[in-house]
Structure formats: structure tokens, C-alpha cells
Amino acid sequence: MLDTPSNRPALPAEIARRRTFAIISHPDAGKTTLTEKFLLFGGAIQMAGQVRAKGEARRTRSDFMAMEKDRGISVSASAMSFDFMNKGTNFRFNLVDTPGHSDFSEDTYRTLTAVDAAVMVIDGAKGVESQTQKLFEVCRMRDLPILTFCNKMDRESRDVFEIIDEIQENLAIDVTPASWPIGVGRDFIGCYDILRDRLELMDRADRNKVSESIAIEGLDDPKLAEHVPAALLEKLREDLEMVRELMPPLDAALMAEGSL
């Protein structure tokens, strides 16, 4: 059957539902592993791989070259697509996993000319690193909207406020948290979704499962105490009070122009 205008999906609608974004980071911040999680929760794969998987353990799909598998690094940019339903719209996400090592940064620079936005991954223990800063500047030149993902919070990490201060100082950009970790290291149990007032709890037994999501009525909701230990809950409330007092609210227009 010929692909004619009459049987082809409406072009404007197809364009409107598509989003293309790149993931950028310093080497070993967890960029490719995050890519796997996007694919998993987007329904594109059944089990997330690990960059440093040993033996016959499942490895990542985006690192497909022999060198990438052997060394646990991304050498070239790889593009993957998955659908995700949100508020009645079936969005098509085109995800581009980029090389983190400076030796292969030319491929990353070219990739960033073709995306709508970027997800910047930061190691919670190391903060803003050199290659992250270089890639951020490339995004800034294109006025790309940037979402920052602070990774490895289930390991010993720096204080979140310290990381935010470093982002604002080193990258000269305002920061508005959209979610907040509950505990760090061994005490990490999940995140509080600030924008939607939800608890996103981590499944410690199987991290390939979507975590439990619980709707709550603000930080005074009694349901919080049912799921969050008292010490962590007190710390969460103190942290979010500071966030709301000291940091700007989310401004979609500023974010879209790459200023937030």
C-alpha cells in the first residue's frame, strides 16, 4: 500500500507529540544506566541493564559496540525511542545517549544541535564535574531547556543544598527542585515529588520495578508517617520549607528558554 497523504497520519499532530532529548554528564555519573531506566519505565524493554555488569549479567542496550561493552563507556551517540502516555496524549520520546568522555565529545556536540532539551546527570557524591560543565555550556549556547538529575542518592552523597549551590555558582543558572530525596545512602527510601505532592518510593528488592507512587495532601498529611520514618520525615519537612522560602517557583517559560 502506497504511503499517500490520505492514509498518512496528520503531520502536525505527529510532530506535536514528539520530544527529542539528550542525556549529558561527566563519565561514570550514571548517564547510560539512566537511559536504561527511561527505556524500562517507558515500556521499551523488560529489564534494565547495567553499564558495569559482570560475566553474563545483562548489559545496557545503548552501549552496543565491543569497546563500549568491554570498557563500560559510551563511545558514540545512540538514539532510542519509546512511547509514554501522559494526560491523554501518547508522546513519542526520542532519547539520545551521548558519550561522556572528552575523547569522544565531538559526537556529543553534534548531537546537541538536534535535540529539544537535555537531561544533565550529576553524581551525588561528586557534584558538577569538568565535562558536565563543558557540555552545559554547549546547551547554553543553544538555549536548550535543561533538567538536572542528581544520581546515586542511594550511595553516600553530598548534601543536596550543597550540590544546588554548586550548580548555581559553577553554571550560573537558577535552580528550582522538582523532587527531593528522602534520606541518602543506606537511609534512602525514595523521593518526594514537589510538583505533584506524591511519594515515589524505591523498591529495594527489585529496582527493575516501577516504585510505589502515593498521592498525599501536602507535608502535613498523616499518610506520610505511614511510609516515612520519623527522623527522615522531620528532615524532609525542614528541607522543603527551606526550598520554598529560598528558591524560585517553577517557571515554565524561563525553563523553556534555558534560564532555569
Regions found by a protein language model. Give the residues of each.
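P-loop NTPase catalytic nucleotide-binding module
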Residues: 2-29, 124-260
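P-loop NTPase switch module centered on the Walker A-proximal segment
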Residues: 2-122, 128, 177, 231-235
